[in-house]
Swiss-Prot record:
Residues 627-695 form the S1 motif domain. GO terms for biological process: mRNA catabolic process; RNA processing. HAMAP family: PNPase (MF_01595). It comes from Brevibacillus brevis (strain 47 / JCM 6285 / NBRC 100599). This is Polyribonucleotide nucleotidyltransferase.
Amino acid sequence: MEQQYRTYDFELAGRKLTLEFGKMAKQAHGSVLVRYGDTAILSAVTVSKEPKPLDFFPLTVNYEERLYAVGKIPGGFIKREGRPSEKAILASRLIDRPVRPLFAEGFRNDVQIVNTVLSVDQDCSPEIAAMIGTSAALCVSEIPFEGPIAGVIVGRIDGEFVINPTVAQAEKSDIHLTVAGTHKAINMVEAAANQVPEAIMLEAIMAGHDVIKQLVEFQNMIVSEIGKQKMEVILHEVDPEIDQAVRAYAEARLKEAVRIEEKQARYDAIDDIKAETKEHFAAKDAEAYPEQEKMISEVLGNIVKDEVRRLITDEKVRPDGRALNEIRPLSSETTILSRTHGSAMFTRGQTQALSVCTLGALGDVQILDGLGLEESKRFMHHYNFPPYSVGEARPLRPPGRREIGHGALGERAIEPIIPSEVEFPYTIRLVSEVIESNGSTSQASICASVLALMDAGVPIKAPVAGIAMGLIMSKDEKSFSILTDIQGMEDHLGDMDFKVAGTEAGVTAIQMDIKISGINREILELALEQARVGRLHILNHMMSTISEPRKELSPYAPKIMTMTINPEKIRDVIGPQGRVINKIIEETGVKIDIEQDGRVFIASINHEANLRAKQIIEDLVREVAVGQVYLGTVKRVEKYGAFIELFAGKEGLCHISQLAEERVAKTEDVVAVGDKVQVKVTEIDDQGRVNLSRKAVLKEQAAAEQAAETPTKAE
């Protein structure tokens, strides 16, 4: 039966939130039009009828930006939206992370979530509207989802928390925290902060959760009225006989292999046991083996997972032998690469990141063409994860969602310590190459990038370090273990990946992903404190490598010279169709960027070229003063007079009658092109034309000479 049109209202942070059902996308299994202020999002969810023969849950979350939502037409020749923007990818991840843990384990049906941005009110976050819409659409559909969930943004202004701050409020806030969760627990955190203490970050998270509870109750009320009966699904389960047989054959040996401390040796031993076990069962029953292979692989994986978790929770022993709060051995060095502007390598156990800092002119900023107000980005951090970092051979592809997400996390962590444009007028790009990986690569890239900034001579406000925390819950969920500096196996087999970056003074970024339904305040508080202790340990190590930014930039970095001109003179520097500024660039080899307020930035590796360009610009904007005498150059000779250049870009006419004291028959009799002559500015007319006189200068010179020759009365 077709769903009837229903609307439900909720006041969220002083603005109206409306969920409209039965109006759009009625053939989807669940859909809702979310209106938050003037923001409008269509959230639609669908599910396949049959499960897929996969060993993972095939969930896809899409966040589709449409430029018509902000009244823009896409640029380029095609004039339509292309691949998702970086912001759209991050929004998809933001929605995916709190939703994914709330599907039943063993659910293998395809689930697709599509959020289409139809209209954007900059003061009402479309990401938050899409997150709420996703949850509501799933909850009213027949898809088995253990929600609802909700999310909010938390800011802090003058010590007070603000829910879903407006653009104006966000500019004053020292926290930008997105938190999501269920009525009982928090299951996703994404934060940027300006060196905020852990205790305040915790309170901000809990303040957000208080509003989330209300939004969840609001959705529960909707579900009670219009929710569909959930579909019956076949959850993937392992045949108990296969489980018992595989455990009897391989469990003891796998448990021994898990205790091998060195990563590659441990993985090799586990892989050998798995391969030998599969060969055993293939030989034992060749006919049935093809159907049993996936289950056998799953049981082998479960044995490893169960043993790793048991060792941590019961024996407090980690796969590599570390204590629960112990950080792997650290090493770092700077100036790895001679010709780059700044470089550093940071190693933590078997995780290694090489970061390179490049400084550019302000014209090198990234131009953004999206749904937000931000038009350009002066600081960038990019993250690359090549296959050789984990000893694999696979095709190289453009950065995926993971790489973009890790790059953005590093960018958020480091941005609060980047000097202002006034203090350091450069565009800054950091690139982190993960050259060896055993977990926590995003945090290693943050550490390496900060070292590279200091190596490049960027006057950062304070060094930042990052660390990844893990969580292992007991089967009864009555006890838990928090791990410091998790490695790959602990990340893969654990319940939480909790990344925290910051300075000695406080937090600059947080990212939390979990695989269970949620965590409480106690776990958050302990994880934040344990991360703080670990972060300070890493910062001490980093400071022993380089204690402060270098005093001088690399000789290969551009030197930037700043000057200020009258904004009304900008057009004189640029010239018609940019001819003047392009000529300066061509002659000197510099880069020139001009701001609307009259600030001019000149960049070049060659300091002398900067000075030359600056002199030309100063000449272009110099004001011609009536009564002033200039030494000019004759540029053009006409019957009626000579055009004389006073300085770059400024010419005046010396009429033939003003060339000499006596009458002049021909201009050429007095001056020729290229001659240097002294002239006086006699007039600037209403059209800005400059009239000059050589005659006036000659008269003044003659009068001065006569005065010098005439004896005084005293003589």
